[in-house]
Amino acid sequence: MRGLPNFYHSYTFFFFFLLILFPAYSISANTLSASESLTISSNNTIVSPGNVFELGFFKPGLDSRWYLGIWYKAISKRTYVWVANRDTPLSSSIGTLKISDSNLVVLDQSDTPVWSTNLTGGDVRSPLVAELLDNGNFVLRDSKNSAPDGVLWQSFDFPTDTLLPEMKLGWDAKTGFNRFIRSWKSPDDPSSGDFSFKLETEGFPEIFLWNRESRMYRSGPWNGIRFSGVPEMQPFEYMVFNFTTSKEEVTYSFRITKSDVYSRLSISSSGLLQRFTWIETAQNWNQFWYAPKDQCDEYKECGVYGYCDSNTSPVCNCIKGFKPRNPQVWGLRDGSDGCVRKTLLSCGGGDGFVRLKKMKLPDTTTASVDRGIGVKECEQKCLRDCNCTAFANTDIRGSGSGCVTWTGELFDIRNYAKGGQDLYVRLAATDLEDKRNRSAKIIGSSIGVSVLLLLSFIIFFLWKRKQKRSILIETPIVDHQLRSRDLLMNEVVISSRRHISRENNTDDLELPLMEFEEVAMATNNFSNANKLGQGGFGIVYKGKLLDGQEMAVKRLSKTSVQGTDEFKNEVKLIARLQHINLVRLLACCVDAGEKMLIYEYLENLSLDSHLFDKSRNSKLNWQMRFDIINGIARGLLYLHQDSRFRIIHRDLKASNILLDKYMTPKISDFGMARIFGRDETEANTRKVVGTYGYMSPEYAMDGIFSMKSDVFSFGVLLLEIISSKRNKGFYNSDRDLNLLGCVWRNWKEGKGLEIIDPIITDSSSTFRQHEILRCIQIGLLCVQERAEDRPTMSLVILMLGSESTTIPQPKAPGYCLERSLLDTDSSSSKQRDDESWTVNQITVSVLDAR
């Protein structure tokens, strides 16, 4: 027994030795006391009780700057949800978090505070403690009071780019905070970016997505179930949404009812609002929802008194009783000028309301709310106010309750196929549907004659309407000229009028038809001074109408490889498509033996004119290129997934990407595009069309094309944007490889950055090495030889926009060393077993290269 004290003495000494040797374990699991500190060098962290979240220092990507932040510990992919010193990073690996003078502070190498909770005043008697809670909230509180009233400061009051469950977005009267989320500057730069998501408390509260000082997207007000502008926001088994409006707070939040489900709402550095859920089996974040989704989500897309409907073409429509403010511009598919009343209101003169169903309510920042009355009382209230222009229920649950009224103009309205709610817009008596019924009552004793006249009017009206819908402008048949009816196969209704009537069925489409003389005048008789470019199809000219409207005229040459079929195809497809990243077709011309397409004029012409011109590509810094990549990806996703049709472009290349004055990319040239059914995944053709260097192997060799063919072309384009080198015609003096081969070789050798355009590295303010390497990796994934290995465009966008998304390692690309075109009459070829064929060594029945 005499040796027992010596054993305990030795054990105690060993225990204290371990504490000295491993200081990382000197801090409690989820708290930091006033006597403790967190340092970068010790690699200490604080972990929430349920091991879901972790707080510590980190540096993103390959940067040398350090930040204090919170991330998910329970999942395999490092995902940051909060950053303390996002705009004041530590410049070296020396940094400390501690409690000092009743504040949490982050100190740099000289013990100078770079971040603090900035609490002032108050009588703090007991010691303070910092604690990381189970929900990811980092709090500073009284060490003797763990109740909510003991909290002096919390990270949930200062969000960065992520809204977590139980975190509140919006205004709190007690603290005076209006909490909002703001994007990172880039995927590997946590500093404050350009985009923010804020709750507007004025009028009928709603949330806006901002790009600096400009509104981009609006959620619509909360209608008791969901936001008016988010119809897909349905109740879920494990997710509960909450919107609170009271004197104490106006906030939005959500909570998760299952502890093993992780979800977050975040805003990407490119301005995309996204909800993610963690998929354990895939070990990845799944994009559950995102906004803006389409052109109709763009703020004020159709101006005042106009509404947007993605299922009509054009997407902009005037509310019943209104007409386009500028018919000519409206006819050219620019709805920003909005609409005006056909008949002015007459207060007390029989005004009424037209009921619009399944609508996103107009902007409500200046609207008035009365939650104590119903829809009938709301209607009377609006009628009594001569300035009232519309009303709706504030709560759509049950039979509806509450009242919101608008005075002044109505804007940012859209119609949904499902969801939305009823909106009642005030009209003059003469514009109401039941005007004929009221007239019949006034006639009284002459009802018989009135009915006869009324029936005659209806018959005449219907006859005129039928005539209007069936009219097609037919041009004389001169030589090989085709009638416009035959040309467009009755799928596009051609109108000679600039104003497009909205009386036609939404399945039809009216496209303005311009006369040859009008186009010739607009282009100064197709002068060389107006020439913008030239291709296998013909020449593109700049034109200007008498009202100053600029346009681009694509004039097909008589010998164009883009023949009548391609012309019809382009008109049918692009006339029905509406997206910010697709070029807009304004009109067409089939006259005097000519075929011409009239597009919106884009000031910065095509991407290739900037990318491959050394005198012009100097302004293409990395941020601009990254935005162009994202825009092209969104446009392609719209074609593949989000449009009314599933469309394969088949000719995606740099010269078919046009740039507007803001350098927003727009996909053009749909002459080779094909429509797929929703259940179709691929098709086969004996006529291979497209451009060498952009065609996928399976398409070039076997005529098989699918969405993955476009993905391949996108991958080539992405790598061209990064390198400013063409895939076709690329030459490397050391090895006879095309661009894809060069990128692949450098990637395997760990020299991925060597292919970057030096212009990018010179613009140090926007050069983000880690982000560029991710893009190169994504590009290589897109150009993999086997179509099934390539990602979908939805996954591409997810990988581009989310730093937390895992990117797999790419396999070898499908690329070529030389071109060998064989007899075009042959449909197959033989090769020896020892021959190594490449993508461009192909045999096809008919080959059209442009």
UniProtKB/Swiss-Prot annotation:
What are the recorded GO MF terms, alphabetically? ATP binding; carbohydrate binding; protein serine kinase activity; transmembrane receptor protein serine/threonine kinase activity; ubiquitin protein ligase binding
Residues on Cytoplasmic side: 463-850
| Transmembrane regions listed in the UniProt entry | 442-462
User: What induces or represses its expression, per the UniProt entry?
Assistant: By wounding and Xanthomonas campestris pv. campestris.
According to the UniProt entry, where is the signal peptide? Answer: 1-26
Query: What PROSITE patterns is this protein classified in?
Result: BULB_LECTIN (PS50927), PAN (PS50948), PROTEIN_KINASE_ATP (PS00107), PROTEIN_KINASE_DOM (PS50011), PROTEIN_KINASE_ST (PS00108)
Per the UniProt entry, the Enzyme Commission number(s) are: 2.7.11.1
Q: Its principal location?
A: membrane
Subunit annotation: Interacts with PUB9, PUB13, PUB14 and PUB38.
Q: What name has this protein been given in UniProt?
A: Receptor-like serine/threonine-protein kinase SD1-8
